[in-house]
Amino acid sequence: MTGRTGVLLIHGLGGTEYDLGSLHKAIRRAGGDAHIITLPGHGTRPEDLAKVHAEAWLDAVTAQYRALEAEYDTLHVAGMCMGALVALLLCHRVQHAKGRLALLAAPVYIDGWSTPWYRALRYLLYQVPGVTERMRVEEGEPFGIKNPVIRALVKKKFARQDSFHYPWVPLVTIRQVDRMRGWVRAAAPDTRCPTLILHAREDELTSLRSARFLEAAMPDARCIVLDNSYHMICADNDRDAVARHVLEFFGFDPAHAVSPAMARRLARGGGSGEAAPDVPDGTP
């Protein structure tokens, strides 16, 4: 055992570590060890997701968790978007008792304000052989970002085909997420580790219904609602608040949520960063 505190971070669907913004840096500044797993089918090309099942994601994070729990007296888990579903299922599977759990924008329900009315039709398509492998679900505006400056940068990254996030995912992969959403609803009442739920009021992908469900269903959970972000809360306007809440919940000093350079800028009256004059390098 190292005597240090470890944190396992899990990114979202089609994403990378950038889904979590600069949270890993805040954890390290605070004295923790941040470990970011790359889920199977990610970090390469979207086509590689087509043959990956949800079980592979859970097996991968379980293996990582088992390796880390041998190193740390305290081990926390945090997940963003789909990664939050994986994180909850992991903690349920291993009966996580070595630390706490943070669920960031968990999509238990796909019912946000930007989701199309015909979203439920995908369940019919799931029954048609071969269709889900060929159909693509494209990323598009607003990219989970309320801040217009950051959103414009994200749009440029997609246009340049940067590797920070897949531009699309196969519909068959959405089916795997739907499977996990059902598992989460069943597992939540028996996932007993202390849990923090962070969710944006204006999340365009998944409404506050998801957060309220988790808060009510889980035995030891509390929810904090963010008022100035869309879905990608680790990179949007509330990113510093997210880092503060997570650090404090995990027992770290929340003062480390912002970098020393940003802290000096704020001390000089440089503003809160809401207009993103300095976009964090963890922008998704």
Predicted feature residues:
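The serine-hydrolase catalytic nucleophile loop
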Residues: G14-H24
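Conserved alpha/beta-hydrolase
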Residues: A30-P46
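Gly/Ala-rich beta-loop-alpha elbow adjacent to hydrolase catalytic centers
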Residues: G79-G83, A87
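Flexible "cap/lid" loop of the alpha/beta hydrolase fold
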Residues: L101-V128
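Alpha/beta-hydrolase
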Residues: G140-A187
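Short beta-strand/loop motif that positions the catalytic acidic residue
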Residues: T191, I197-H199, D203
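Conserved alpha/beta-hydrolase "acid-adjacent" motif
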Residues: E204-S210
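Catalytic active-site module of serine/aspartate enzymes centered on a nucleophile-bearing elbow/loop
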Residues: R222, N228-P284
